[in-house]
Each structure stands twice: as C-alpha cells, then as structure tokens.
Design a protein with these regions (language model features):
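A generic structural signal for short beta-strands and their flanking turns/coil linkers
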Residues: 29, 48, 55-57, 75-79, ...
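C-terminal edge-of-domain segments
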Residues: 1-3, 115, 119-217
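Short, structured patches in soluble enzyme cores that scaffold and shape functional sites
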Residues: 35-37, 63, 83-85, 111-113, ...
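An N-terminal domain-cap segment
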Residues: 2-61, 71
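Short, structured beta-strand-loop surface elements
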Residues: 65-126
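Catalytic micro-motifs at enzyme active sites that drive phosphoryl/nucleotidyl and oxygen chemistry
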Residues: 35-42, 69, 92-97, 140-142
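Short hydrophobic-aromatic micro-motifs
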Residues: 59-62, 81, 105-107, 153-154, ...
Length: 217
C-alpha cells in the first residue's frame, strides 16, 4: 500500500489483509482496467472490463496485441485495476442513508509483459482455471500461434487496498421511530442451467460445468 492507495474516506472500512485481498480477486470473475490513453490534449481515460487471474502476488491480464489499453499498459503507463463484489442493497429510512454492502479492491501499478513461451502458457491456463476451475485438463492445449497472438501482462499486487461495508443501515436517531421498512436485500450471482451447442448435443454435462459456482460457499 502507498499514499495513493491509502483510504481516506471511511478508513475504518479498510481491510489490510493480503489473504482477504487475494480471496476477493479469486472470487471475482472479472475486473475493470483503467489507463490514460493518448498524448497531450488528446489524452483521455479508458476503462475496460477484463477477465483476470492471479499468480501469487501478481495480477494477470491478457488480450489481443491490438488492444490499445493493453499496449498502453505494456509501454509503461500506470494503470488502475478495480474489482468490486456487491453483497447487499442497504435500505435505510432516508434516501441519504441508503447504501450497499460491498467488497472492493483497487490495484495501482505498472505492468510488465510476459514473453517467455512457457510462462505465457501457464498464465493462459490460469485464465481458464480462474473462470472455470477444472477446465484446462478437458480442452486441447493452446497452439504456438495462439500463444504468440496473445498479449499477457503481469501487475504486482504491491500497491493495492481493500474496502468493505457490512451490516445494517445506519439511520439518524430522529428517523428510528419511522414505520418505513429498513434492512438488507442480499445480492448474489445467479447461475443458470448450462446450454450445450449443436455439436455437443445431448452429451452429459461434465461436473466442472454442472457444479460451477462463484462466491462464498
């Protein structure tokens, strides 16, 4: 953590725990990556959602070498990655005190490109396993051309912070006599029934697909 990732608004909600930060990164399916693109008066912020993965204390990103965002990050530009999971809507007795229960991580830093073939293959497998655990052993390996045609970046998790809100609404004491309903609406990510493509047909759905889940168990 550095001065730029130190919480100033509601610092009591900070979670200074690497294990908790890693767990949130692993639980979330995707992140948002932001950079400043362009030069001079043409400079402008760009934020793109991306699938991510984690390898130890590094965050992995990947995509097409033609991606402006990834090329900008590869060239040494500072980037900002955010990951947020919503756990509940918080309904209070006044509009001002409505809120959300959430867990959020902010990562800042500079990315380095992974160019070694074997390291890239390992990273690409991590993306698949992050999204669908148990999948890599059931699909063909990436071809040399596919590996060459993918840009993989690694971002250190040295400069990051986590913030979370939990619990019920916090109302003004003067509103507590109101008959307005207040409390929480829990939120979770729903998972539908797997839909096979035409070539798969009526084949049995494998366990890693049928029992895919995300979040706290």
């Amino acid at each position: 953590m550095s001065d730029r990732t130190t919480l100033r608004r509601k610092p009591d909600r900070a979670i200074d725990n690497c294990q908790a930060i890693h767990a949130l990164i692993d639980e979330a399916v995707y992140c948002h990556v932001g950079v400043m693109a362009g030069d001079g008066t043409d400079a402008h912020p760009v934020v793109i959602p991306m699938l991510h993965a984690r390898h130890g204390d590094r965050l992995l990103l990947h995509g097409s070498p033609a991606s402006r965002l990834l090329r900008t990050a590869r060239d040494g530009m500072d980037l900002c990655v955010t990951i947020t999971l919503l756990d509940a809507l918080v309904l209070a007795r006044s509009g001002l005190h409505h809120s959300m229960n959430y867990r959020s991580v902010v990562v800042m830093g500079r990315a380095t490109e992974i160019t070694d073939h074997d390291e890239k293959v390992e990273a690409l497998d991590r993306f698949v396993e992050h999204a669908i655990p148990g999948r890599t052993v059931r699909i063909r390996p990436a071809t040399t051309q596919e590996v060459k045609g993918t840009l993989v970046l690694s971002v250190p998790l040295d400069d990051c912070s986590m913030k979370a809100r939990t619990g019920p609404p916090i109302d003004d004491e003067t509103d507590m006599d109101s008959d307005t309903w207040a409390g929480l609406i829990p939120l979770h990510q729903g998972v539908g029934i797997p839909i096979p493509d035409e070539a798969t047909g009526d084949a049995t759905v494998p366990g890693h697909v049928a029992f895919w889940s995300r979040g706290r168990r």
